[in-house]
Design a protein with these regions (language model features):
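Short, positively charged and aromatic/hydrophobic N-terminal segments
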Residues: 9, 15-16
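C-terminal catalytic domain of photolyase/cryptochrome flavoproteins
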Residues: 38, 204-205, 211, 230-468
């Protein structure tokens, strides 16, 4: 019997040793693709067992500026990535928790040979997480292969545009043709309520994932973007020609370089064909991509001290409580200003709104209603499917008047309404209560005579609010 016990112990020890498989971890973050992925290529070059890891972080999803719509878009993007990995013989390994704790458990249970990832480092929390992972890897002696990306590799004092375009022209990294099978178990897919995210009702939200991103890109480059970025377009026309790629770029379902190269190729073909209108539109689009990347880089150099990621409010506006009627009216699209209310209702239902209208909403809350900027910025962030903390708060601080780069943006909502929605199509779509009003009264219904209002069954203050 003692001999049998000893044999059993030896077999268990051998099993444990064999289970220490020395994993090469590819840690996916906001780069949910297998194409043009430097960290994945680095992990593949290391050979051996490869674990495509994604960690759901409670600390992130429990923030005041995240939401169910963002979570669901991320899960859809991850599911598409999982399908791409399975086509190559592997699959996603899902975990939930604090990143360094998850890595520590994996190392204790299986052994980690190397860790490969793209750094973020654009907000204090992201920079701190990157630092903690580096410290942990150094402490336990694990080789780290950190890929910084364009926004960190270019000095703010360099010729940024030239360097960015040089990076964009580099050949894209090919996706691996095959991957070894996942050698460790994955946790199940979490749901939004696991992180305390409440249902926020976004019936017309776009669907995440690389498959949808590529379809959207092809639509845009094959004719959908013919008028993209053109001056003096109405809101409805802008919506019809928008690329709708921002959320996909945020999650990294497609790389910025992949989109830029596809747009440049299409632009060159259009120039050859003599289609200057469309070629010019794609030029504007690539310039917008550059501006987006520059904003990401700028965010890494902005001093963000508030927990909301906004600089301290130099105007000392009082932060609104959730019960504040002004905040409630603004959040629910009931300010009495039709363009503002239509914009908010559109964002509520779709998760998408062009940037100038987002700025209009935030400016009205903080500069007209004089609400403290933190809560309005958080509410607006929750509604945006393409929310990326670093870029969002850099832009928000400029709109609100907290940036040294520019004064606050304070547009007149009625004047904006007349110029951006002259035929009232956008307002009528989202505010059916006043859809029957003639164009001359639609943008400022409080100026309409009572006879015009009553003729269409409108009672200001009841069927539609008086302006705040």
């Amino acid at each position: 019997m003692p001999q049998l016990i000893e044999i059993y112990r030896l077999s268990q020890s051998l099993f444990y040793i064999c289970s220490m498989t020395e994993l090469n971890i590819i840690w996916f973050r906001r780069d949910l693709r297998v194409h043009d992925h430097a960290a994945l290529a680095s992990a593949c070059a290391a050979g051996g067992q490869i674990v495509p890891l994604f960690i759901f972080e409670p600390n992130y999803w429990q923030r005041a500026d995240t939401s169910e719509r963002q979570f669901e878009f991320a899960v859809e993007s991850l599911a598409d990535l999982d399908r791409a990995l399975r086509q190559r013989g592997s699959q996603l390994c899902l975990r939930s928790g604090v990143v360094t704790e998850v890595l520590s458990r994996l190392h204790a249970q299986h052994g980690i040979a190397s860790l490969h990832f793209h750094s973020l480092g654009n907000t204090p929390a992201e920079a701190e997480q990157d630092r903690q992972v580096r410290t942990w890897a150094l402490k336990v002696g694990i080789p780290l292969r950190e890929h910084t990306g364009i926004q960190h590799s270019i000095s703010p004092h360099s010729d940024w545009d030239t360097a960015w375009r040089r990076h964009m022209r580099k050949p894209r990294i090919a996706a691996p043709a095959a991957l070894p099978p996942l050698s460790i178990p994955s946790e199940g897919w979490p749901i939004a309520s696991d992180f305390g995210l409440e249902s926020d009702g976004c019936p017309d939200r776009q669907t995440g994932g690389r498959t949808n991103a590529i379809l959207q890109l092809r639509w845009f480059l094959s004719g959908g973007g013919r008028n993209a970025g053109k001056a003096n377009l109405s809101i409805t026309a802008c919506e019809a020609t928008a690329s709708r790629l921002s959320a996909h770029l945020t999650m990294g379902s497609v790389s910025e370089r992949e989109v830029w190269q596809a747009a440049m190729k299409a632009q060159a073909a259009l120039v050859t064909d003599g289609d200057e209108t469309f070629a010019t539109a794609l030029h504007r689009f690539t310039e917008k991509l550059a501006k987006r990347s520059r904003r990401v880089q700028a965010s890494a150099r902005v001093s963000l001290t508030d927990t909301s990621l906004l600089p301290v409010d130099i105007h000392n506006r009082e932060e609104a409580s959730l019960a504040d009627p002004r905040l409630s009216a603004w959040t629910n699209g009931k300010t009495g200003f039709p363009l503002l209310d239509a914009s908010m209702r559109c964002l509520q239902a779709t998760g998408h709104l062009e940037s100038s209208l987002r700025s209009l909403l935030l400016s009205f809350a903080t500069c007209h209603l004089w609400l403290g900027p933190v809560r309005p910025a958080q509410v607006l962030a929750q509604l945006c499917t393409d929310f990326a903390p670093a870029m969002y708060y850099v832009s928000a601080s400029q709109v609100i008047g907290l940036s040294k780069a520019a004064p606050a943006y304070i547009p007149n909502p009625v004047r904006q309404s007349l110029s951006r929605d002259p035929d009232g199509a956008f307002i009528r779509k989202w505010i059916p209560e006043i859809a029957e009003l003639p164009d001359q009264y639609l943008h400022a219904p409080w100026e309409a005579p009572k006879s015009a209002l009553s003729a269409h069954g409108i009672i200001l203050g009841q069927s539609y609010p008086m302006p705040l």
